[in-house]
Amino acid sequence: MTAPLTLALSKGRIFEETLPLLAAAGVQVAEDPETSRKLILPTTDPNLRVIIVRASDVPTYVEYGAADFGVAGKDVLVEHGGSGLYQPIDLNIARCRMSVAVPAGFDYANAVRQGARLRVATKYVETAREHFAAKGVHVDLIKLYGSMELAPLVGLADAIVDLVSSGGTLKANNLVEVEEIMAISSRLVVNQAALKLKRAALKPFLDAFERASQNGV
């Protein structure tokens, strides 16, 4: 019996916005990862199962073949590297932007002009380093894993680099967006070996995902 394909997803927005794409392929996930303790979830298609992993781990699971394909944000792929993965489709889901934000009243543009050395808190250290280096901005980067907006409020950092959707969280914490680094959306990533060895099994899903993403499903 042929082993089922494995799709790697992370909990939250990406999982929720991938469900309509799976539905377009005629598949439903049998359990909700928010309420189930299981990390391997069956689907209504016996030839597909879903594994739930951290968003930053999706590329690793796919690259090493523990998953045949997965859905990962551009932020994760840029920060952690997706060079060993086939990335056939921008799914146009989980859209947001990666931006620089500072406390309201902080003159970021003037600080940059004056050549000030800024402390920046972010979990996207490599992406932030490349961005500021390209602009000639001097920064000390502080790696955090969450609650980024807190860092400027308690004097840990002058600025943050984080994902922004509506901007509501920034506003609630008296922060303002001063620079967009890149637009973010989630991509389908495929293991290179699986693409060759399991192409017939993968193709219906790749085609359905592509059609659904183009049609705004």
UniProtKB/Swiss-Prot annotation:
Organism: Burkholderia multivorans (strain ATCC 17616 / 249)
Quaternary data: Heteromultimer composed of HisG and HisZ subunits.
UniProt cross-references to PROSITE patterns, sorted A to Z: ATP_P_PHORIBOSYLTR
Primary enzyme class: transferase
Domain of life from the UniProt record: Bacteria
Descriptive protein name: ATP phosphoribosyltransferase
Note on domains (UniProt): Lacks the C-terminal regulatory region which is replaced by HisZ.
Protein's UniProt keywords contain Transferase: yes
A GO biological process held by the record: L-histidine biosynthetic process
GO molecular function: ATP binding; ATP phosphoribosyltransferase activity
Chief place where the protein resides: cytoplasm
Catalyzed reactions per annotation: 1-(5-phospho-beta-D-ribosyl)-ATP + diphosphate = 5-phospho-alpha-D-ribose 1-diphosphate + ATP
Pathway listed: Amino-acid biosynthesis; L-histidine biosynthesis; L-histidine from 5-phospho-alpha-D-ribose 1-diphosphate: step 1/9
Gene3D superfamilies: Periplasmic binding protein-like II (3.40.190.10)
Pfam families per the UniProt record, alphabetical: HisG (PF01634)
Protein family per UniProt: Belongs to the ATP phosphoribosyltransferase family. Short subfamily.
Listed GO CC annotations: cytoplasm
Enzyme Commission designation: 2.4.2.17
Biological role stated in the UniProt entry: Catalyzes the condensation of ATP and 5-phosphoribose 1-diphosphate to form N'-(5'-phosphoribosyl)-ATP (PR-ATP). Has a crucial role in the pathway because the rate of histidine biosynthesis seems to be controlled primarily by regulation of HisG enzymatic activity.
Compartment list: Cytoplasm
CDD domains associated with the record: PBP2_HisGs
